[in-house]
Amino acid sequence: MYIENSALHQSDRSKKTAQHCFTSFPLQTHKATTFASRLSQRLLNCSHTNKIMNAQESVKIRFLSHRLLKQLQLSSESVTASIEHLLRSRRTAQVWNAPKAVITPPDGRYMMATLAAADNPQILAVKSLMLNPANTARGLKSIYALVTLLDSDTGIPLAVLDGGWVTAIRTAGLSAVAAKRLANADAAIAAFIGCGVQAQSHLNNFADLFPLKEIRAFGRGAENRDALCRSAENLGLAAIASKTAQEAVQNADLVITSVSLSPALKPFLDARWLKPGAFVTMTDLAAPWFAESMPVFDRIIIDDREQEAQMQKPLVRPDLVSGDLTALVNEEITGRSTATERTAFIFRGLALGDLAIAALAFQHACADGQGTLVDL
């Protein structure tokens, strides 16, 4: 059952029985539909969308900080259900997703904006994000972002959210949606290449989704690596700080790569290291992977074919792509077919994912009366 309250959903991993098969996870379409209906109704109850405002009434925007958003503790199930609902709604013309707009100055900065809108829930979301590797030397985070929500019918501004939190939850949520269909259900060992924010959010999601027993962590920074290992141990998992990327990846059931992008990054990961049956999610545009090793995968899914067609440089050779996430969720293409297939999800980030998570957080914050209201 999908959980909509603000309490953190904690899976009882001791009750999970590992299946020595490649059975896909239940798609639970009717539950996702019910979830979406309740989400939409609660949004109507807590936003401006349930009333016609007169000319004298002031518009108030709800500001949701990173600290507050973390306190909402959205469940993994509610995150994936929200994303799956919007992916299905694309086929009924209730959701619109624009390809991301990107600016990449020659000094290594990465500037990006995404736009998505839906009729159910009645929300439009715009995210602006800036990444600068030089921020580290300034004592700043490398990424800053904001998400703005508007009513998709009236255009009334609704909220501004910390985009870093939305991006972390959305990215892990997209990976989880793909993993449900592309990974073996009995996956027990997860390898993390890159140990920052994305690794932490993926650990939390995948620990709920799979009967994990062990993680392996490899990254440049010992502080982040050790923090990830501690998080795994707090979940009751064995944690190994791997000395090399190959050591981490070999014999892992799940591989999560979230290597920071920079002009200096050179490929250092080889898909030929993967064991039969492994699933890889690449949140880093597949940049750290040797392109010549990609044909090892039996099935590669990307986030969005329409978006990919407009990108200057493809994530992977187009002839290696089996389809995108919307087609996968709508069962227009198959996921894993055998227990020994090597599968991968490679993605840039999908605007409707930002919409799904921001709308979900907005719903919970409104229902709980949280956030700072600011006059427009």
Regions found by a protein language model. Give the residues of each.
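Aromatic (phenylalanine/tyrosine) cluster motif
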Residues: 2, 22-25, 35
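Intrinsic-disorder-associated, low-complexity terminal segments enriched in Asp/Asn/His/Tyr and depleted
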Residues: 2-5, 9-12, 20, 30, ...
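N-terminal ligand-binding/catalytic initiation module
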Residues: 39, 46-167, 176, 183-186, ...
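Glycine-rich adenosine-cofactor-binding loop
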Residues: 175, 186-207, 219-224
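NAD(P)-binding Rossmann-fold cofactor-contacting core
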Residues: 210-231
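Rossmann-like adenosine-cofactor binding region
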Residues: 237-315
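Adenosine-phosphate binding glycine-rich loop
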Residues: 287-376
